């Protein structure tokens, strides 16, 4: 199993959690028993870019903290399997502000949103209370395993 994050920072904020995100992604892939090579794209963007994406793809004029776009592209050949989950767009300026508002550390806020987004890429959603609770439990389990507490 190989878990890869393709990373691009287009925001003006220095990002210090990529190493942690790689650990998170690897642990999540192990816990969910995903086999083969798996990857996702992670892009940090400005608030302006985030707002444009929200308008274009969600038809809502707001600045999101994170947007997830599932792909589920699977390339399978003899003895090889590559699974591209999709793209995650994070807005660091919004996430930092949110962390302060919620009284969380920036590490906690970034990590929570990253794990939550990966589960969206894997097909989890907030369709009802039961699936919402399951997703929240999975997210918290990953964070607790890495010592990232509220």
From Swiss-Prot:
One of its GO terms (biological process) is rRNA processing. Keywords: Cytoplasm, Endonuclease, Hydrolase, Metal-binding, Nuclease, Ribosome biogenesis, rRNA processing, Zinc. The keyword rRNA processing applies. It is an enzyme of class 3 (hydrolase). Its main location: cytoplasm. GO terms for cellular component: cytoplasm. Its cofactor is Zn(2+). It is found in: Cytoplasm. Pfam families: YbeY (PF02130). Binds 1 zinc ion. GO terms for molecular function: metalloendopeptidase activity; RNA endonuclease activity; zinc ion binding. It comes from the Bacteria. Zn(2+) binds at residues 116, 120, 126. Its EC number is 3.1.-.-. NCBIfam families: rRNA maturation RNase YbeY. Belongs to the endoribonuclease YbeY family. Single strand-specific metallo-endoribonuclease involved in late-stage 70S ribosome quality control and in maturation of the 3' terminus of the 16S rRNA. This is Endoribonuclease YbeY. The gene is ybeY.
């Amino acid at each position: 199993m190989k878990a890869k994050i393709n990373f691009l920072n287009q925001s003006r904020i220095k990002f210090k959690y990529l190493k942690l995100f790689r650990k998170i992604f690897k642990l999540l892939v192990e816990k969910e028993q995903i086999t083969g090579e798996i990857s996702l794209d992670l892009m940090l963007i400005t608030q302006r870019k985030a707002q444009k994406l929200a308008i274009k793809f969600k038809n809502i004029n707001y600045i999101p903290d994170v947007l997830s776009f599932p792909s589920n592209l699977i390339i399978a050949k003899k003895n090889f399997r590559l699974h591209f989950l999709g793209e995650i767009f994070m807005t660091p300026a919004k996430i930092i502000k949110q962390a302060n508002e919620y009284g969380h550390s920036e590490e906690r806020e970034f990590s929570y949103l990253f794990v939550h987004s990966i589960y969206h890429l894997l097909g989890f959603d907030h369709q009802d209370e039961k699936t919402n609770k399951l997703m929240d439990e999975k997210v918290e389990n990953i964070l607790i395993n890495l010592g990232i507490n509220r």
